[in-house]
Amino acid sequence: MLTATRGPYLLVVQQDDSPFNPREDDNFGKMVCFHRQYSLGDHHNYIDKDDFLRDLYLKTVGDDERGAHRYERALDLMNYKIKAPFGSPDYERQVDERLMKVISQKYLMLPLYLYDHSGITMNTTGFSCPWDSGQVGWIYASKEDALREF
C-alpha cells in the first residue's frame, strides 16, 4: 500500500484483490486472439487463425456444402494468383486479405496487435517494434449487429 498527503487530502493506493475483467462487461465486439503464452480476448474454440477466417467466410457466403465448395475454390484460385511462395508470410497475408475482402461484406473487423515488453499492450494499429510486437487476432462484429445497436 502506498500513501501520499497534500493539504487536507490523503491518497491511498492499494492492490485490488478482486478486479473485474473488462471483457465480461457488455462488449460489442468479439476479440479472437491466438498466442502461445497468453490467453487474450474472448473465449473461442478456433484452432488457429485459418479456422477462424474460414468460419467467418462460411458465415458470409453460406455455411453449407455450397459455401464450403466456394471456400475451397477460392483457395485454389489464390494458389494460382498469388505470386509469393506458398506458405510464406507474404502468401499468408495475401490469402487473409482476400478472405477478409469477402468477410467484410457482413462483418466489421479490426486487427489486434500485441506489444510484449515489460508488460503487454494491445491496439488495432500496430507498433513500431516488430521484434516485440505482432498481430495476435481480430476484434469483429456483424454489420447487422452494428446497425441494430447504433
Where are these regions (language model features)?
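Acidic interaction surfaces
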Residues: 1-150
